[in-house]
Amino acid sequence: MAPKARLVAYKTNWNVQCPTFKTIGSNEIDVMAAFEAAIDDGVDVINYSQASNNSAYLDDGTGIATFHAMKNGILTIAGAGNSGPNAGTAANNYPWVLSVGASTIDRVFSAHGTRFYDFVSKVDVPSELYPLITGADARISGANVSDASLCQGGSIDVTKVTGKILVCRNAGRIVAKDETLASVVARDAGAVGMIFVYEEKIGDGFTLSQFHAVNTIVLSYKDGETLFSYINSTRTPTASISGVTNTLGVKPSPIMGSFSSRGPNQNNPGILKPDVTAPGVDILAACPPEIFQSSYCMKTGTSMATPHVAGIAALIKKVHPDWSTAAIKSAIMTTASPLDNDGMPIRDSNKTSDATPFAYGSGHVKPNMAMDPGLVYDMNQYDYLNFICAYPPESTTLKEFSQQHSYKCPRSFNILDFNYPSISIVNFTGNAIVTRKLKNVGPPGTYVPRIEPPPGVSIMVEPKTLVFSQKDQIIVFKLILTADINHLSTDYIFGSLVWSDAKHVVRSPIIVKAKNK
């Protein structure tokens, strides 16, 4: 994304964990130390490919550390997590952080129509036919059939597998190490390759791409059922693993990764999370060769999507060094697109249903458009402090987040007036007024609104047009939402607001949830 950027890495994960462990995969004190070191070093952007602990929120080291970074003009871009597709799993839900979901790119590595990953470049791809054997059929005497089906260590008979392609199932979960460990078992058993099949409950639209110790094909549940049907139809099943085919311009794309964590925001549903989605499936990454036996490997996860957006933020910072972290965040969010390369709504991981903003946030990032967004929803640390003030006990919380312990909270705080680039209205009673401020960061222009209201909701905007006569001018507008609450869906419903001057498109998703009757 930003090939001329200089990188510095700070270690947060250690083998020893403190009793006050609150952040997934590391000790929060180490996370805070890393952030403070980065702040002291004067970095411009922080990439945080790690999920925070949702239960802590404003009482954890990540929230405090990222807030300190924001105060020093440093935007943190963080992964939304890999706990999808379940609802309410999005992590790093702090409003001063840009959280990122993961979706596919328009490139597919395939072998005879199936997903293929050849990560160990030193191993020659076997092009001839080899016998196929399932883990269950290859189990060692006394081993559990289920363990052998998963190709778990100690369950496979080497004498049955040597010189064959081993077929393994996953454990009904999306865990990268399942693939890796199974491939190690296959290698140690003398297999020439492995076919790894995902279970039905994970869905048919996603397979992980991780390090494999042998040449591996990864199949979805549907393709796996076809394979098992073939194996059961003959006494001598055979297969070959062909060379990889790199296909570009794949449509439709992007498609959401099913692993990508989803909203609604469990900490505060009035803030939509994740904020955007970015490429995070089958991403070519540099890997430590002493671990992965190669300097490069294909990786999948929101940890891959996050640095894409961090690079975009670094480019914006270079072009607009005077912009606040909120302005950079707004530029990325309001120029993101909810459409795929067919001009249709981004699809969810099952490839048939449309994804929602709980999967992709404001949409898939558009780097070039983000450099010139036209308008931004700007904020400063005091806006975020007012947000924190809504969480009791305010005195203790404020002390953790700011050195300005004497900061006086406002008497009231209405999240509908919080100048966030996306708009979320929960506990909607049939009437609501949303206030936002837009700052002109482009040339003078007149912006007109285009509204797609959520089903059953009427929306009026005041004023009808926004006329900007100069740069940095700020104009306040209101959205007035009305609905017959008795005939409104009790589920979350979605719409959008677009301000445009015919050149710039400033888009905000709208999320409405009616109050329980």
Predicted regions and their residues:
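Loop-rich non-cytosolic ectodomains and luminal regions
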Residues: 1-517
